[in-house]
Amino acid sequence: MSEYRVNHEPVFMLASSPWRESSLRVEAFSRRYGRVALLARSARKRQSELRGVLVPFVPASVSWYGSQELKTLHRAEWMGGWRQPQGRALFSGLYVNELVLKLTAREDPMSELYDALAKVMEAVCREANHIADLRRFEWKLLNALGVAPDLHADGTGGDILADKTYRLMPEEAVMPVCRDTGALSHEAGAIVEGQSLIDLREGSFRTAESLQQALKITRLLIGTLLPEGLKSRQVLEQIRQFDRNTA
């Protein structure tokens, strides 16, 4: 990062951990500078003005200085917008933050990804049904990382067609496959309809099946990048299992 001092940069807080007696180490995702590590001195003290500002899921405007990897937070202000998520929506917010924290490189500018993060966080905090917003964000993230396959043309050079069936594999071009169910059962990767690929590409899901197939695609690609899994998803699965067992 070339600037020694950065002022009034919009960020989202991804995670924080205690630092020494009363400070916090914060991982934040900024619009112009990507993911940055910030040292918030005395932020854990009861009288600190930062206590109500350094929170996840809502945008903040922060200023920092320093040329080392760990910058010193100079100022932080809440930018307003929306309330913290509640209930199951909290896990959606944690899931998004964990994706960004684990998959982005430090100080790699991704302004479009920041805008996508702001959009999905607003949906998570405000909309009861934000599943489509999560799928759109996952696809934006995969594109920003350069690992999303081309959904305009298949591996033969032909256009992706709504009435065809395709096989999607990590690090490979999308390929058309036979609709025969016996043959499809032996295909590796994600077997999806062309319309679902078009919907994912355009970010507009026409049916529940299309949305479900989008989940299949993003889970396959993200799972390749994070074979160890995601803590937020594991916790949510445990809660769902508990709900099923106690229903």
Curated annotation (Swiss-Prot):
PANTHER family: DNA REPAIR PROTEIN RECO. The keyword DNA repair applies. The lineage of its organism: Bacteria, Pseudomonadati, Pseudomonadota, Betaproteobacteria, Neisseriales. Transmembrane segments: none annotated. One of its GO terms (biological process) is double-strand break repair. Gene3D superfamilies: Nucleic acid-binding proteins (2.40.50.140), Recombination protein O, C-terminal domain (1.20.1440.120). Disulfide bonds: none annotated. GO terms for cellular component: bacterial nucleoid. Keywords: DNA damage, DNA recombination, DNA repair. Pfam families: RecO_C, RecO_N. Belongs to the RecO family. HAMAP family: RecO. InterPro entries: ARFGAP/RecO (IPR037278), DNA_rep/recomb_RecO_N (IPR022572), NA-bd_OB-fold (IPR012340), RecO (IPR003717), RecO_C (IPR042242). This is DNA repair protein RecO. Involved in DNA repair and RecF pathway recombination. Involved in pilin antigenic variation.
